[in-house]
Curated annotation (Swiss-Prot):
Protein species of origin: Azoarcus sp. (strain BH72)
Protein name as annotated: ATP-dependent Clp protease proteolytic subunit
Catalytic activity: Hydrolysis of proteins to small peptides in the presence of ATP and magnesium. alpha-casein is the usual test substrate. In the absence of ATP, only oligopeptides shorter than five residues are hydrolyzed (such as succinyl-Leu-Tyr-|-NHMec, and Leu-Tyr-Leu-|-Tyr-Trp, in which cleavage of the -Tyr-|-Leu- and -Tyr-|-Trp bonds also occurs)
Entry similarity comment: Belongs to the peptidase S14 family.
Classification via CDD domains: S14_ClpP_2 (cd07017)
InterPro entries documented for this protein: ClpP, ClpP/crotonase-like_dom_sf, ClpP/TepA, ClpP_His_AS, ClpP_Ser_AS
Organism ancestry: Bacteria, Pseudomonadati, Pseudomonadota, Betaproteobacteria, Rhodocyclales
């Protein structure tokens, strides 16, 4: 998790994901084509793919709010494959997940590291999942600010504040004590899907659709 200057990136421009498949649907009004992510959004599936930054956060927040307006009583499915990124961008997603009325079910595909792991754990209790070969990693916020000594001190205090806030929220979602969270996030802490269940980051490992 990067606690420094918010990241500005063109990431989550679909072009950055390579060739995006198109889906063509037929109806009485003719044919309509969607990119695959837009089609899955109709099924209430939201993706976090790649780094967490201001661009990805804004897109995900907008999708969550849209799906709430479509049906406030139906679950949203949040698929995560992310190495993490900006703390402030991640907290924008987190706060929206907690704010909206629909339950948000989270699923790790590939990896959920740093802020990705935090968002994975923030899903609705009992509806947080990992696929069998997923990897989950937690650690403390990172900072890389440069400048005058007084400014460095200000940013150091901000990082310590964010670490305390994040540890408290992670303790709430996992059931671990804050002291245990502080110890376990002191360095990069990688977990298998099974270990993530044991730690309380997720509730179940899914091996097939029938497990949901």
């Amino acid at each position: 998790m990067n606690a420094g200057t918010p990241q500005h990136s063109s990431a989550w421009d679909p072009v950055g994901l390579g060739l995006i498949p198109m889906v063509v649907e037929q109806s009485g009004r003719g044919e309509r084509s969607y990119d695959i992510y837009s089609r899955l959004l109709k099924e209430r599936v939201v993706f976090l793919v790649g780094p967490v930054n201001d661009v990805t956060a804004n897109l995900i927040v907008a999708q969550l709010l849209f799906l709430e307006s479509e049906n406030p009583d139906k679950d949203i499915y949040f698929y995560i494959n992310s190495p993490g990124g900006s703390v402030t961008a991640g907290l924008a997603i987190y706060d929206t997940m907690q704010f909206i009325k629909p339950n948000v079910s989270t699923l790790c595909i590939g990896q959920a590291a740093s802020m990705g792991a935090f968002l994975l754990a923030a899903g609705e209790k009992g509806k947080r999942f990992c696929l069998p070969n997923s990897r989950v990693m937690i650690h403390q916020p990172l900072g890389g600010f440069q400048g005058q000594a007084s400014d460095i001190e200000i940013h150091a205090r901000e990082i310590l504040y964010l670490r305390e806030r994040l540890n408290g929220m992670l303790a709430k979602h996992t059931g671990q004590t804050i002291e245990q969270i502080e110890k376990d996030t002191d360095r990069d802490n990688f977990m298998s899907a099974t270990a993530a269940v044991e730690y309380g980051l997720v509730d179940k490992v899914l091996t097939s659709r029938a497990d949901t």
